From Swiss-Prot:
Belongs to the UvrC family. Residues 12-89 form the GIY-YIG domain. The gene is uvrC. Interacts with UvrB in an incision complex. Pfam families: GIY-YIG (PF01541), HHH_5 (PF14520), UVR (PF02151), UvrC_RNaseH (PF22920), UvrC_RNaseH_dom (PF08459). This is UvrABC system protein C. GO terms for biological process: nucleotide-excision repair; SOS response.
């Protein structure tokens, strides 16, 4: 079915539309009160340059019907999180204040401090502009609710609990001293506390305490009683602090050309406690209302705290739908307001002035960085007699540990700056044993073969190639590139420690001055690819270390393996289990249980099948 026919068949119904390019990649996700009117509008009449560029890449589209606009907005946000489409507005953190993070996606969630809010399923609370207030909050939380703070992911079973468990600050799920349901109750209580739902929390704690007492679980009831008293004390203090003000976020943004910056002031108890800002990508050509709507959806879908009132410098598109969505996320009413007078208008003007100032400062810094990078590239071109300015530079490195799990990495700089989205990593497939030269040749042959095959991830060829190593690695690289018919690309090797630069055709190294901007950019590129390779290699080692004999048993996938380890605690304990013990594990059947026994050298009748006495 061609696009015209699909457009003609669009329903007049709320939903989400998904635009695909010729490669099938998702390039834009949007929501609409009427899919028919909204999607057809892209292919009718004139649009802003960015929208026209997006439409020119649309080869196909699909849509999902929803009951109403709020449901469409929720689905739109989830799909944007999942696919990160090229033409949707996105926020890029420059810096942020610390948040409290609760890893709710884990079986036994942890509480942590973090400065980055990512889409990992965790809940985030904050930001905290005062280190003192953050420490006080954490101290209070750890005293009230004993949930774990360790870094184990996944949770590693232990025979004995840690010190925190002995002093009553952890329920010790690692030692099997608490079940998931009880632990989740504690986590839910923490979330209610951080959300400020103190009345609901007091009620919940009372009910849990009374239920524990009715079951004659007096130790648990006493712990809940102490938590209840502490929460009630905190509530009384906060009532006094909150009596003079209210909680709100104040949001504005500034734009200049393609650059845009969003700024949020956090007002708690009637006082501005801090701010956070984000750079907006993909906002050019959009109206101010569209940008504000995108900013709200992107920021609050991250799992951050949502106050009861959000003050806005510009009226967002679909304000009523966004307010309903935010209210659903918060679990209470959220008001979106564009003040016209009074102190709240003054606050928003201040936020906007700050946004303009921050954007100007950012643009000035970026211009200076671009000028510095260009000067370094010009110096590099002159010193090395390069045929053209090395705008795209690629570096390659090989990493291995005692000859095992060799990996390769490619880092990319464009105009002297890192371009992480273009970084690539390679698992070495054809080389056995430690052989950096052969591994490097495999990586380069795969990279340039992909370019010849028009793979969009490798389509852009470099103006300059840097190899982490000396003459040996350099010759291996050039040999491969010539065999691939790549053509002339200036290729150099940068040796560590003495920082000598090698080129093909001479054994005499080039020694650049230590203060040289050209050397500094090469060092940065070399160090970046080395870091990327080491990180990938470490991840592979950790993944290999977590493997066990269970991974080789048919029918035991990640989910079943997790259930087995949760039930028994370790592979050693599983090896002592009987068929009946295994069948007690959630999701287990007799066939797989028998395979596990066989894989562990046991028979289903309980006898050892190894033939040992």
């Amino acid at each position: 079915m061609d696009l015209e026919e699909k457009l003609a068949r669009l329903p007049d119904h709320p939903g989400v539309y998904i635009m695909h390019d010729a490669n099938g990649a998702i390039i834009y996700v949007g929501k609409a009160a009427s899919l028919r009117n909204r999607v057809r509008s892209y292919f009718r009449g004139q649009h802003q340059p960015r929208t026209q560029a997006m439409v020119s890449h649309v080869a196909d589209f699909e849509y999902i019907l929803t009951d109403n606009e709020v449901e469409a907005l929720i689905l739109e946000c989830n799909l944007i999180k999942q696919h990160r489409p090229r033409y949707n507005v996105s926020l890029k953190d420059d810096k942020s204040y610390p948040y409290i993070k609760i890893t709710t996606q884990e079986d036994f969630p942890r509480i942590q401090i973090t400065r980055s809010v990512t889409r990992d399923g965790s809940r985030y609370f904050g930001p905290y502009t005062s280190a003192g207030s953050l420490k006080e909050t954490l101290k209070l939380l750890r005293g009230l609710f004993p949930i774990r703070t360790c870094r184990d992911t996944p949770l590693q079973p232990r025979s004995r609990p840690c010190l925190n468990a002995h002093i009553g600050r952890c329920l010790a799920p690692c030692a099997g001293q608490v079940d998931r349901e009880t632990y989740r109750e504690a986590v839910d209580n923490v979330i209610m506390f951080l959300e400020g739902r103190h009345t609901a929390l007091v009620k919940e704690l009372k009910e849990q305490m009374e239920a524990a007492a009715a079951r004659l679980e007096f130790e648990k009831a006493a712990r809940l009683r102490d938590q209840l008293r502490a929460v009630q004390e905190v509530c009384e203090k906060q009532k006094l602090a909150a009596a003079s003000g209210e909680d709100a976020d104040a949001i504005a943004f500034a734009r200049e050309g393609e650059a845009a910056l969003g700024l949020i002031f956090f007002s708690r108890g009637g006082k501005v406690i801090g701010r956070d800002h984000f750079f907006l990508t993909g906002s050019e050509g959009l109206s101010r209302g569209e940008v504000m709507a995108a900013l709200l959806k992107e920021y609050y879908s991250r799992g951050v705290e949502i106050p009861p009132e959000i003050l806005l410098h510009d009226e967002p598109e679909d304000a009523a739908t966004i307010a309903s969505w935010l209210s659903r996320l918060r679990g209470g009413r959220v008001n979106l307001r564009v003040p016209k007078r009074g102190t709240k208008l003054k606050l928003l003007r201040l936020v906007h002035e700050n946004a303009v100032s921050l954007l100007q400062e950012h643009l000035l810094t970026r211009r200076r960085q671009e000028e510095g990078s260009r000067a370094a590239l010009l110096e590099l071109q002159e010193i090395l007699e390069l045929p053209r300015l090395p705008r795209r530079m690629e570096a390659y490195d090989i990493s291995n540990f005692q000859g095992s799990s060799q990996v390769g990495a490619m880092a990319v700089f464009v105009d002297g700056r890192p371009l992480p989205s273009a970084y690539r990593r390679f698992q070495i497939k054809t080389v056995r044993g430690p052989n950096d030269f052969a591994s490097l040749q495999e990586v380069l042959s795969r990279r340039f073969r992909r370019a010849a095959e028009q793979d969009p991830h490798f389509a852009d060829l470099p103006d300059f190639v840097l190899i982490d190593g000396g003459l040996g690695q350099l010759h291996a690289a050039r040999e491969t590139m010539e065999a691939m018919g790549v053509g002339y690309i200036p290729t150099f090797g940068l040796a560590k420690e003495e920082e000598l630069l090698f080129r093909v055709g001479t054994s005499e190294p080039i020694r650049l001055p230590r203060e040289s901007k050209a050397l500094q950019i090469l060092q940065h590129l070399r160090d970046e690819v080395h870091r990327f390779a080491i990180t990938y290699h470490r991840q592979k080692r950790e993944k290999t270390a977590y493997r066990s004999v269970l991974d080789d048993i048919p029918g035991v996938g990640p989910k079943r393996k997790k259930a087995l380890l949760r039930h028994f605690g370790s592979v050693a304990a599983i090896s002592k289990a009987t068929l009946e013990d295994l069948l007690a594990v959630e999701g287990m059947n007799r066939t797989v249980a028998a395979r596990i026994l066989a894989g562990l050298g046991r028979r289903s009748d309980g006898e050892d099948s190894t033939g040992s006495p």
